[in-house]
Swiss-Prot record:
This protein's name: NADH-quinone oxidoreductase subunit A
Subunit structure: NDH-1 is composed of 14 different subunits. Subunits NuoA, H, J, K, L, M, N constitute the membrane sector of the complex.
Entry's localization field: Cell inner membrane
GO cellular component, one term: plasma membrane
Species in which this protein is naturally found: Acidithiobacillus ferrooxidans (strain ATCC 53993 / BNL-5-31)
Substrates-to-products reaction catalysed: a quinone + NADH + 5 H(+)(in) = a quinol + NAD(+) + 4 H(+)(out)
GO molecular function, one term: NADH:ubiquinone reductase (non-electrogenic) activity
InterPro entries: NAD(P)H_OxRDtase_bac/plastid, NADH_UbQ/plastoQ_OxRdtase_su3, NDAH_ubi_oxred_su3_sf
This protein's record includes keyword Zinc: no
Superkingdom of the source species: Bacteria
Gene3D superfamilies for this protein: NADH:ubiquinone/plastoquinone oxidoreductase, chain 3
Amino acid sequence: MLNHYLPVLIFLLVALVVGVAPLLMGSSLGPHRPDSEKLSPYECGFEAFEDARMKFDVRYYLVAILFILFDLEIAFLFPWAVVFDQIGMTGFLAMMLFLAILVVGFIYEWKKGALEWE
């Protein structure tokens, strides 16, 4: 049983070493000379005009969530399209139900004005 998972374990260990080793080497071998210029916030070569922690409009997050939702829909459609001829009418109806639920949700978001930018 362990023989089946040994390549995966080796892959994870190599990935961990490749990811962590440069970080450790940079922090241990790199110069440590902090000064006020290096510790100040950087904004295109100029002094910061205002607080760097500006509040974002909630609509950005809403659009991002909607994008992820419909991107995930496409991720479900690809495997379905590959096995479409093997799953028959039951698979077709299940996917149509899934798409109908997403369309109803999209229409709801549209009617509520979540996609408007004014």
